[in-house]
Amino acid sequence: MSTITVVIPTYNEDKNIAECIISCRDIADRILLLDNMSTDQTKEIAESLGAEVFQTERSYKERMAMLGGEIPIDTDWILYMDADERLTPESAKELKVLCDEHADADVNGIVCRYRQRFLGKDLNYGDSVGRKLRVFKPGRAYMEDMELDEHIVLRSGR
C-alpha cells in the first residue's frame, strides 16, 4: 500500500482550506501546508483538521523546493493541491489505486483530470476540463520557474 503526502501552498485561505483538507484526508498519510504567513485563520483551521503547517515568507517556488530538504518527505508520493481544489470521493479512490499500482514502477508522476467550476457549478464550455501533473514521487519533480501559471515538471521517468 503506497503512502501519500498532500502538499497545499497557502496564503489567507481560511474560506477554502477546510473543504480542501476534508476532500483529501481519507487518502493522505500526511497533510502539509506550505503557508506564506497567512494573517487570517488558515493555520488554525488546518491544524484543527490534523494538517502540519510550515510557515515561511519564502516565495512559492522556494517553498516547493523545500520538500525533501528542509521538510522531509518519507511517503511514496506527493499530491499537490491548491486550497481551492477538491477531490471527489471517486477521484480520491482512483488516485489511491493508481499510486498503489505504480509504486514500484518507473512511473514518477500521475496526470490528473480536473473540471473548472464557477459559483458552485461545473463549466461546460471552453477549457472547462483539463489535465495537470499533480501527483509525483518525492525528488522526481520540480516547479517551473515562472511568474504565473507555473507547472510541476518531472525530472525523469514517466
Which positions does each model-derived feature cover?
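Catalytic metal- and UDP-sugar-binding loop of GT-A-like glycosyltransferases, i.e.
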Residues: 56, 81-83
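Conserved donor nucleotide-binding strand/loop of the catalytic core
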Residues: 29, 43-74
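Conserved SAM-binding loop
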Residues: 3, 10, 14, 38-41
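Short, well-formed alpha-helical segments that are part of the catalytic scaffolds
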Residues: 8-27
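Catalytic-site signature of metal-activated, phosphate-bearing donor transferases
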Residues: 61-68, 75-81, 88-158
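A conserved acidic beta->alpha catalytic loop
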Residues: 23, 35-44
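Short, conserved active-site loop motifs that form the nucleotide-linked donor/cofactor pocket
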Residues: 4, 51-52, 107
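Cell-envelope/extracellular polymer assembly enzymes that use nucleotide-activated donors
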Residues: 3-5, 30
